[in-house]
Amino acid sequence: MSAAVSIRGLATRFDEHWVHRDLDLEIEAGELVSLVGGSGSGKTTLLRQMVGLLLPTRGEIRVLGEPLFGGGPERERALRRRFGVLFQQGALFSAFSVFDNIAFPLRELKRLDEATIRDLVMLKLDMVELLPRHAYLMPAELSGGMIKRVALARSLALEPELLLLDEPTAGLDPDRSDSFVRLIRTLGRELGLTVVLVTHDLDTLAGLSTRVAVLAEHRILAYDTIDAVLRIDHPFIRNFFLSERSVRALESAKRLGD
């Protein structure tokens, strides 16, 4: 398999503070990878760099085989259409209906007629387990779980190869969180997506991840399956994964995923 995301020699500095130094990461196509780390470890910063919202101080990021930065605005836009992004709060347009939020990236293409756009919007709603009547609600009328699903539908509108998620279950109660994790896992498998997510939630991590990338000491400290990472003897890994609460959460999530 080819790499969906390849990061080499990445460094990130804000003023005098180094967030990343000599960070390398290679994510194969079809993987579901969780980025985890302590507060200030740079996991959300790294995701923002993968999305193209933030330039690194140095280093290279390649997405779907192409350099993420450089080559001109048109080439960068074409590449970014090949991946979808779900931000932590959903980032829906508050003045747009659910329908128009999902239709927004389709209309931006300026290639599709409204009948085709309508069919695609309804298809994406069905994919995230929402009903046609939900298309005509406004974001203020949605529950937190529905906002996440609408945002996910919008991120899938252009049929991406790569899906980038920032804290996808933040703010959801345990039942809605478990349901959303199952949905992402199912869509990842059925659509052949590569999924990269930032999470601090161990239930989400265990329920979704084929691999885990642990950020600590300004770099990727470990990158492997959960079971392999748990065998690494390092203070951060012990504190993050092997506390009594963490072990219970991982065991519970694994049972749900089996």
Predicted regions and their residues:
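Conserved ABC ATPase "signature" region
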Residues: 67, 115-133
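The feature captures the beta-strand-to-loop junction immediately N-terminal to the Walker
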Residues: 36-38
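Conserved ABC ATPase signature
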Residues: 138-142, 146
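Helix-to-loop junction immediately C-terminal to a conserved catalytic motif
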Residues: 51
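Conserved catalytic motifs of ABC-family nucleotide-binding domains
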Residues: 159
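Catalytic Walker B motif of ABC-type/P-loop ATPase nucleotide-binding domains
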Residues: 163-166
